[in-house]
Amino acid sequence: MASNYKVQKPKFLEELEEVIDIYDEILDRDKLQNKIIENETIEGLVNKGTTIDSCVFKNIVFNGTSLRNVDLLDTRFENCDLSNIDLGDGSIHRVEFINCKLLGARLDECNIRDVRFSNCLGKYINLSYSKMKNVIIDECDFTEGTFQQVKLDKVNFNKSNLINSFFNKTSLNKIDLTTCDINGIDVEISDLSGAIVNSMQGLDLTRLLNIVIK
């Protein structure tokens, strides 16, 4: 189902500068701004409180990367591998993840606003305790993702795989899941109140009631 929510897009300069040494920019200056980074592997980048503003990452592989408390603004990740990256306790605003791998990525305890995940492989992604507002998750695989105690406000799940995902203590009120695969989703009955599901999904969710339908 198409989203009725307006998600702001990242804002960039018309021309972005190529990065000479991303480690110097982030580790020594704690800031990366108005840059484009392409076709690189970034190894073992660990920093806390980094600001990344108005940047584009294309075809980047992040290995052993931890940027907790990151301030991520007006940035696009395209065809990147962010598997197991740690962006926990960060602020993620006007950011796009396009055709990215997010296997086991940590975005827990984040403030996530005006963000689009499109065609991403995000099995085991962790979004626990985050606040998500004006977010689109479009044609993504978030199998066995963890959404524990997440505050969802105007979050659109479209044609995405949520098989065996964990939504403990996360209200799904007004959340439309009709185009998604939610088989085996782990959620409390009280948090399903107001959720929008199709008839087949509703039948599957009766397992939470411990009843038998003949």
Residue ranges and their predicted role:
Residues S3-K214:
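Tandem repeat scaffolds
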